[in-house]
């Protein structure tokens, strides 16, 4: 029996399962207590129980396997991992571990890990010889992440516009710069759907920091991938802990030569959370940002890279501007030159209800010639030459109308020739 499967079951099903196993007094129990009772009954029968999670090592040397469904929040159903197991398998925070577990004995509060079956979806003996993420050689993105699905839907127009204006590669470090209400969250959702559809081999994580709860639900229902969130009613320490767990997990997967994509909404809110958490250094920049506060969010964003030894970590993060807060502008200025791809969104275009509201002239990818063939590059440069003299609103409107008339970008380029 698997602990993770039990967590996903609705409460009425758990109650029915408990009653079928003749467990008494389950009528008005909490979901947690139900799972405990079921697993204890299973263990008494001598059956094996399995569980999995992402390891968080605490300062005392032991660790816990946190659940992605609970956005890595500490809970009573976490699985205890002993210091001897951590040393034996050279485990680090962020390792995804699955294995055999046992229920708590008298006086214990947590399930404990008995035997490790998998580390980062790989055999445990393979995990010991991995190169550390910090020792990898970073390169420019070279393999393209094509977003176009080619079904002619309105959502696909966003993906096709990004493919034309600022193509994304595996290992890209991209910034989506947007004023409020310009459609940045919808754009991230479209990107997530495209990656889930076109690149199922990529491990997709959507990280929502300081967002509205209903947007988290909508994202979780529409995206094929892991949606991790810390809503605006959570404390800043929680935002920071979630972000640290996600980036550590991503690094461990890249060490196993996986391609990981993180979509972060938004890096501004994450930087604000770090600003609240970091101890005061006495040096304060404009807008109330502590001089040391941006070090850790920069480390998060800077982890995105294409790795020569195999694997890649792509991070696309949204940055807020024109919010009326001086702090947000300072945070954006600090991150401005750090990415190798930028998409600028324009409120004026969004107010005219043209989506995606992209300012084409200001958006682009560095070294885009590595991502595409010479013929496609020439076509894109010709398109930019046509759009450049226009006002940004007229340029986006022109491109939007042309894309709406065709199903794919190849078709669009053919129609341009004619």
Curated annotation (Swiss-Prot):
SMART domains assigned to the protein according to its UniProt record, in alphabetical order: AAA, CSP, Rho_N
Q: What are the GO MF terms of this UniProt record?
A: ATP binding; ATP hydrolysis activity; ATP-dependent activity, acting on RNA; helicase activity; RNA binding
Kindly report, in one word, the top-level EC class recorded for this enzyme. Answer: hydrolase
Q: Name the positions where ATP binds.
A: 169-174, 181-186, 212
Give GO BP annotations, semicolon-separated: DNA-templated transcription termination
Domain (Rho RNA-BD) ranges: 48-123
Q: Which residue spans adopt a coiled-coil conformation according to this UniProt entry?
A: none
- What keywords are annotated for this sequence in UniProt? ATP-binding, Helicase, Hydrolase, Nucleotide-binding, RNA-binding, Transcription, Transcription regulation, Transcription termination
Assigned EC number: 3.6.4.-
Report the superkingdom from the record. Answer: Bacteria
| GO CC terms, sorted | cytosol
Binding partners and assembly? Homohexamer. The homohexamer assembles into an open ring structure.
Function, please?
Answer: Facilitates transcription termination by a mechanism that involves Rho binding to the nascent RNA, activation of Rho's RNA-dependent ATPase activity, and release of the mRNA from the DNA template.
What the record says about family reads: Belongs to the Rho family.
Q: Which HAMAP family match?
A: Rho
Could you tell me what this protein is called? Transcription termination factor Rho
This chain's source organism reads Allochromatium vinosum (strain ATCC 17899 / DSM 180 / NBRC 103801 / NCIMB 10441 / D) (Chromatium vinosum)
Gene transcribed to yield this protein:
rho
């Amino acid at each position: 029996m698997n602990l993770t499967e039990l967590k996903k079951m609705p409460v009425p099903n758990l109650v029915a399962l408990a009653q079928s196993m003749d467990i008494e007094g389950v009528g008005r129990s909490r979901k947690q207590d139900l799972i405990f009772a079921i697993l204890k009954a299973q263990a008494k029968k001598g059956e094996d129980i399995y569980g999995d999670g992402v390891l968080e090592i605490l300062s005392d040397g032991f660790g816990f396997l946190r659940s992605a469904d609970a956005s890595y929040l500490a809970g009573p159903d976490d699985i205890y991992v002993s210091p001897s197991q951590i040393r034996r398998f050279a485990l680090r925070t962020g390792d995804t571990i699955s294995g055999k577990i046992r229920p708590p004995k008298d006086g214990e509060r947590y399930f404990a890990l008995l035997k490790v079956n998998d580390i980062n979806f790989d055999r445990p003996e393979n995990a010991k010889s991995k190169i550390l993420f910090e020792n990898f050689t970073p390169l420019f993105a070279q393999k393209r992440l094509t977003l176009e699905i080619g079904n002619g839907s309105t959502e696909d127009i966003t993906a096709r516009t990004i493919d034309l204006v600022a193509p994304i590669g595996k290992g890209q470090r991209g910034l989506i710069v947007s004023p409020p209400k310009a459609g940045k969250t919808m754009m991230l959702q479209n990107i997530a759907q495209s990656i889930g559809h076109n690149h199922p081999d990529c491990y997709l994580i959507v990280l929502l920091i300081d967002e509205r709860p209903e947007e988290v639900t909508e994202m979780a229902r529409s995206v094929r991938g892991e949606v991790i969130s810390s809503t605006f009613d959570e404390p800043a320490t929680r935002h920071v802990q979630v972000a640290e767990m996600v980036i550590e997990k991503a690094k461990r997967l890249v060490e196993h030569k996986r391609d990981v994509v993180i979509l972060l909404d938004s890096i501004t809110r994450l930087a604000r959370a770090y600003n609240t958490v970091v101890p005061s250094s006495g040096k304060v920049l404009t807008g109330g940002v502590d001089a040391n506060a941006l070090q850790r969010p920069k480390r998060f964003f800077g982890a995105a890279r294409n790795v020569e030894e195999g694997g890649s970590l792509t991070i696309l993060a949204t940055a807020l501007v024109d919010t009326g807060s001086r702090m947000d502008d300072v945070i954006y200025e600090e991150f401005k030159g750090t990415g190798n791809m930028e998409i600028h969104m324009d409120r004026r275009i969004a107010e005219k209800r043209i989506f995606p509201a992209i300012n084409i002239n200001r958006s682009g990818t560095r070294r885009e010639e590595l991502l595409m063939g010479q013929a496609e590059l020439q076509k894109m440069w010709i398109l930019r030459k046509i759009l450049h003299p226009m006002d940004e609103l007229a340029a986006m409107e022109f491109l939007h109308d042309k894309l709406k008339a065709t199903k794919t970008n190849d078709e669009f380029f053919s129609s341009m020739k004619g």
